[in-house]
Swiss-Prot record:
Positions annotated to bind substrate: R23, H135, T356
Designated name of the protein: Putative 8-amino-7-oxononanoate synthase
The organism's taxonomic lineage, starting at the top: Bacteria, Bacillati, Bacillota, Bacilli, Bacillales
Catalysed reaction equations from the record: 6-carboxyhexanoyl-[ACP] + L-alanine + H(+) = (8S)-8-amino-7-oxononanoate + holo-[ACP] + CO2
EC number of this enzyme: 2.3.1.47
PROSITE patterns xrefs: AA_TRANSFER_CLASS_2 (PS00599)
Subunit structure: Homodimer.
Species of the source: Bacillus thuringiensis subsp. konkukian (strain 97-27)
InterPro entries reported for this sequence: Aminotrans_II_pyridoxalP_BS, Aminotransferase_I/II_large, AON_synthase_class-II, AONS_Archaea/Proteobacteria, PyrdxlP-dep_Trfase, PyrdxlP-dep_Trfase_major, PyrdxlP-dep_Trfase_small
Entry function: Catalyzes the decarboxylative condensation of pimeloyl-[acyl-carrier protein] and L-alanine to produce 8-amino-7-oxononanoate (AON), [acyl-carrier protein], and carbon dioxide.
Gene3D superfamilies per the UniProt record, alphabetical: Aspartate Aminotransferase, domain 1, Type I PLP-dependent aspartate aminotransferase-like (Major domain)
Residues annotated with N6-(pyridoxal phosphate)lysine modification: K242
C-alpha cells in the first residue's frame, strides 16, 4: 500500500480512538423484534427505528414475497431506463392520496433524497436556511449545491427571521427542516416556519423521516396535524425505512417540483431502482399505517410514559416530546461507559457521539416502539436509573 496514505489513515484512526469516536460494527439478529440478539446477547431493543413494529409484520413479508415471485429480485436498471415497474407508480399514487399532494417520486433512501433534492434545486446564487440540528443529509446536500448556507439556532425562529431579513431580495431562498429531530426527539415549529417562508418569499422542504406513519391525519406526518398547513409545504420528504418498516424514501409536492427533480436529481437519475419486493412491502405498509390507529396510539402513549418516568428520575432528556428520547450525558468517555453497562444489563442502548451530535452532548438515544409493553419500559427504566446511580453520572 502507498505509504503516505497508510500513515495518513493510521493517524486519523488513532485520533478517533483517542477522542472516543472510533466506531465498530456489531452483529445483530432479530432487530425487527422487541427483543434482539446483539453480539450473541439478548437485549431489550430500545435502539431501532422500527417504531410501529412493521419490519417483522407478516403482511409486509407476504407482499414482498409475492412481488419477488412476479418481478424477480432486482429492478435491473434505473427508473429512467427500464427499471420503472408499475409498482413504482402505484406507490407514488398512494403517497399522493395519503399526503394530499399532486405528484410523488420514490427514491432509494432518505439520504439520497435530501442530498439530491437540495443540490438540484439550489446553486451558488441561492441561500439555504437550515436548522442547526438538521440531519447530515441536509447539510451535505447544501454543501454539494454550493449555495450560501445560513444555519439558524435550533428551533430559534427569531434568529431565522433575522437571517432572512439580511438576505438579498433578489436571491432565491430555501428553508429546510426536520419535523421530528432524530437525535433530540423534539419537533419543528412548522406553522411559524411556513409564515416566515411566505413573508420572505422562500420555499420550504420538510424532512418527515421520523414522523411519517406516526403523526398527523392517517399518519401522514407532522405537517398533517393541521390539514391546511400541509398544503403550504412546498416539498415533503419522508422515508419508508422507519415507521413503515421497509426501505426507501419519497419526495412529494406540487407537480412542477417533482417533475423538475425527476429530470435534474443526479441521485435519482444515476442509480438502479429499488427492488420490486421493497415496493410491494411499502405499498402494504402505507395501507396499514392509515388504518391501524392503535399502533400509532400505542407508540405515542409509550413515548409519553418513557419520557415522564425518565424526567421524574432526574435525567436530562432535553426537549423531547416524541418517541425518540435521548439521555444527554456529555463526554464520549462517560457515554460509552454508560452504554456498555446498559448492554451488559440487557438493554440495547447505543452511544451517540460527535459528529452525529454536537461536541460535549454525547448521549444514549432511546427509541420506544408501539410493540413495547409498559412492563418492558418499566424494567428498562429501573435498570437505567440503577446503573446511572452506580456510575455517579447524574441521578
Amino acid at each position: 500500500m502507498n505509504q503516505p496514505w497508510r500513515t495518513h489513515l493510521q493517524t486519523k484512526l488513532k485520533q478517533l480512538h483517542e477522542q472516543g469516536q472510533y466506531r465498530n460494527l456489531h452483529v445483530t439478529e432479530q432487530a425487527e423484534e422487541t427483543w434482539l440478539i446483539r453480539d450473541e446477547k439478548r437485549m431489550l431493543n430500545l435502539a431501532s427505528n422500527n417504531y410501529l413494529g412493521l419490519a417483522g409484520d407478516e403482511r409486509l413479508k407476504e407482499a414482498a414475497i409475492v412481488c419477488t415471485r412476479k418481478y424477480g429480485t432486482g429492478a435491473t436498471a434505473s427508473r429512467l431506463v427500464v427499471g420503472n415497474y408499475s409498482l413504482y407508480e402505484e406507490v407514488e399514487r398512494s403517497i399522493c392520496n395519503w399526503k394530499g399532494t399532486e405528484k410523488a417520486l420514490v427514491v432509494n433512501s432518505g439520504f439520497t433524497a435530501n442530498v439530491g433534492a437540495i443540490s438540484s434545486l439550489v446553486c451558488r446564487h441561492d441561500i439555504v436556511f437550515s436548522d442547526k440540528l438538521n440531519h447530515a443529509s441536509i447539510v451535505d446536500g447544501i454543501i454539494l449545491s454550493g449555495a450560501e448556507h445560513k444555519r439558524y439556532r435550533h428551533n430559534d425562529l427569531n434568529h431565522l427571521e433575522a437571517l432572512l431579513k439580511t438576505a438579498s431580495p433578489e436571491k432565491r431562498k430555501l428553508i429546510v427542516t426536520d419535523t421530528v429531530f432524530s437525535m433530540d426527539g423534539d419537533t419543528a415549529h412548522l406553522r411559524e416556519l411556513v409564515q416566515l417562508k411566505e413573508k420572505y418569499g422562500a420555499i420550504i422542504i420538510v424532512d418527515e423521516a421520523h414522523a411519517s406513519g406516526i403523526y398527523g391525519i392517517g399518519g401522514a406526518g407532522l405537517s398533517h396535524i393541521e390539514k391546511d398547513l400541509a398544503q403550504k409545504i412546498d416539498i415533503h420528504m419522508g422515508t419508508f425505512s422507519k415507521a413503515l418498516g421497509c426501505y426507501g424514501a419519497y419526495l412529494t409536492g406540487d407537480a412542477i417540483y417533482i417533475e423538475y427533480l425527476q429530470n435534474m436529481m443526479r441521485s435519482f437519475i444515476f442509480t438502479t431502482a429499488l427492488p420490486p419486493s421493497t415496493l410491494g412491502a411499502v405499498q402494504k405498509a402505507i395501507e396499514i399505517v392509515q388504518e391501524d390507529h392503535k399502533r400509532r396510539e400505542n407508540l405515542i402513549a409509550n413515548g409519553e410514559y418513557f419520557r415522564s418516568k425518565l424526567r421524574e428520575a432526574g435525567f436530562n432528556i432535553g426537549n423531547s416530546s416524541t418517541h425518540i428520547v435521548p439521555i444527554v450525558v456529555g463526554s464520549n468517555e462517560n457515554t460509552l461507559r454508560f452504554s456498555k453497562r446498559l448492554q451488559e444489563a440487557g438493554i440495547a442502548a447505543i452511544a451517540i457521539r460527535p459528529p452525529t451530535v454536537p461536541v460535549h452532548s454525547s448521549r444514549i438515544r432511546f427509541a420506544v416502539t408501539s410493540q413495547h409493553t409498559i412492563a418492558d419500559l418499566k424494567w428498562a427504566i429501573d435498570r437505567i436509573t440503577h446503573i446511572a446511580k452506580e456510575e455517579e453520572l447524574f441521578v
